Amino acid sequence: GSEMCIRDSFSSLFPKHPYGTQTVLGTQENLKNPSITNIKNYYKQWYVPNNMAICMSGDLDPDETIALIDKYFGGLKPNPELPKLNLPKEDPITAPVVKEVLGPDAESVALAWRFPGLASKDFEVLQVVSQVLYNGKAGLIDLDLNQQQKVLNSYGYPMGLADYSAFILGGLPK
């Protein structure tokens, strides 16, 4: 389905970078033979205060919120030897990459383009372009494809990430 298309799109957009080489849970091979020692060591190295952020929103009581954060996270110790990530740079994409993904879900299509990361001015432009194309109401995709029922569903959105971003167009045929 579309989730598999997106995953494979990322492996094509980012063949060197963890965005395309790693999945959230890991590969089937990783999950077949997990080493408890390796899992614990990974957790101790990376799941540390100097490698995390706590995001809150809404009508919060600051004193109560700080108390809860201290209660649940105050005992965590930073890793003073946390390695600096030196992530690989991607080569330019010079030709289309086409992949066919087989699975049990209905047919779908996804097109994806790589862009600079969130801090880039290009990402701001990408967000504007995205809204012109698809915003759930009056974007070009909304008006010309979805509302006219030429497809079962179609969409377009930017995926903003730190090192690179992606723009994804996709849809489900009728």
PLM features: what roles do these ranges have?
Residues K16, A53-G117:
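An aromatic/glycine/proline-enriched structural segment found at the starts
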Residues S11-M52, K84-K89, L126:
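Histidine-acidic residue clusters that define the catalytic metal-binding segment
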Residues K40-Y43, P96-E100, N153-M159:
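Short beta-strand/turn micro-motifs at beta-sheet edges
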Residues G1-I6:
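Short, small-residue-biased leader/transition segments that mark boundaries at the very start
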Residues Y47-N50, P92-T94, G103-S108, F123-E124, ...:
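Short, solvent-exposed loop/turn segments at the edges of secondary structure
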Residues F14, P18, I36, K40, ...:
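Sec-exported extracytoplasmic/periplasmic mature domains
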Residues L111, K121-L133, I141-L143:
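Active/ligand-binding-proximal structured segments within catalytic/core domains
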Residues R7-E29, N51-S57, E107-P116, L143-K174:
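M16 family metallopeptidases and their MPP-like homologs
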